């Protein structure tokens, strides 16, 4: 689980306790984390295709996860949805269902093709489990893993077993070339990563090839943007001088081919965690693997959904296509949903941002 991604729930006495949107499961012992919802009302909302019912406690400020509908349609008392890097490495493959047949043999599992988070995904799961109600494990295409159980202990034990079966040994990657990266470090706002693993996005040819192909899963687009900021070494000085030195429109990281990665000092902890997760996924994915990338409409749907929580992400105007987005720098405008105000930078004003999380 990276940052606010992933969600868990438990059903007790007709109440669905679901992780709050934007909350980190890693902070569950220190913060208020779960939102109580009347399960019957949530199911009615799904049936009527209306907004998920309000929390039982009207004074609670937390909002239920966007995946609340998915948790509600599953019969199990405990549902764990995680963004396992091993599971995602299988979930992005076109041959994933076939390859997992042997790995998950003996477990009541199903593959759910990619569907948008919320009610669309919940309905796909609802159809799948209607035919096989014994299902306890779901691999969500281009998304992650769901395991279920009658209680917390059983669900956690099953999660461990599935993770063991899905485990992939990551590739080794070349060490970074700090000569080129040191040039970037001279510019304000840029720093070396404190996790060497991140350099793989620049030094590992297979990872670069994989990420050039597009967006692999929603959180990649939500937290890191729809395109990868990748530069050849020869372009470092010109690009930073002309575009990314001292501007507000810089990406949160940049990968330099055969050299490594540098981070923007404004990178948030959520963006950092998501980037680390992305590297883990690419290093577990074979260069020759046939991958399913999110389609343009799916990426745009993710960026426009605006319901994931508290992460600010770039959302282009409806008239723009994903290919047009690539012509622009990232994050030119921020809109605050709380007060309706906005600020615009010096670059194109054809973008806006929403608040989102998991």
PLM region spans:
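Cationic, low-complexity basic patches in intrinsically disordered or flexible, solvent-exposed regions
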Residues: 354-356
């Amino acid at each position: 689980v990276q940052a606010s991604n992933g969600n868990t729930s438990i059903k007790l006495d007709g109440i669905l306790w679901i992780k709050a949107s934007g909350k980190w499961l890693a902070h569950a012992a220190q913060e208020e984390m779960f939102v109580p919802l009347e399960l019957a009302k949530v199911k009615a909302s799904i049936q009527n295709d209306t907004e998920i019912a309000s929390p039982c406690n009207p004074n609670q400020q937390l909002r239920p996860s966007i995946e609340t509908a998915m948790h509600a349609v599953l019969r199990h008392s405990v549902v764990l949805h995680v963004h396992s890097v091993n599971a995602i490495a299988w979930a992005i493959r076109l041959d994933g269902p076939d390859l997992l047949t042997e790995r998950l043999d003996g477990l009541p599992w199903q593959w759910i093709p990619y569907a948008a988070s919320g009610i669309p995904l919940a309905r796909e799961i609802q159809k799948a489990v209607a035919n096989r109600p014994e299902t306890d494990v779901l691999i969500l295409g281009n998304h992650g893993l769901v395991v279920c159980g009658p209680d917390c202990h059983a669900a956690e034990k099953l999660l461990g077993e599935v993770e063991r079966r899905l485990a992939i040994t990551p590739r080794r990657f070349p060490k970074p070339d700090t000569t080129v990266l040191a040039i970037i470090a001279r510019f304000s706002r840029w720093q070396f990563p404190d996790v060497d693993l991140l350099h793989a996005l620049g030094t590992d040819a297979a990872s670069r090839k994989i990420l050039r192909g597009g967006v692999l899963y929603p959180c990649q687009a939500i937290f890191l943007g729809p395109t990868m900021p990748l530069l050849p070494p020869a372009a470092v000085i010109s690009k930073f001088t002309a575009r990314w030195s001292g501007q507000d429109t810089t990406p949160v990281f940049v990968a330099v081919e055969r050299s490594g990665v540098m981070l923007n000092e404004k990178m948030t902890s959520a963006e950092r965690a998501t980037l680390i997760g992305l590297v883990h996924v690419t290093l577990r994915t074979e260069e020759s693997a046939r991958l399913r990338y999110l389609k343009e409409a799916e990426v745009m749907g993710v960026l426009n959904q605006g319901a994931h929580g508290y992460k600010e992400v770039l959302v282009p105007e409806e008239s723009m296509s994903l290919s047009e987005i690539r012509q622009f720098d990232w994050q030119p405008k921020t809109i605050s949903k709380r007060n309706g105000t906005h600020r615009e930078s010096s670059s194109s004003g054809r973008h806006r941002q929403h608040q989102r999380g998991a």
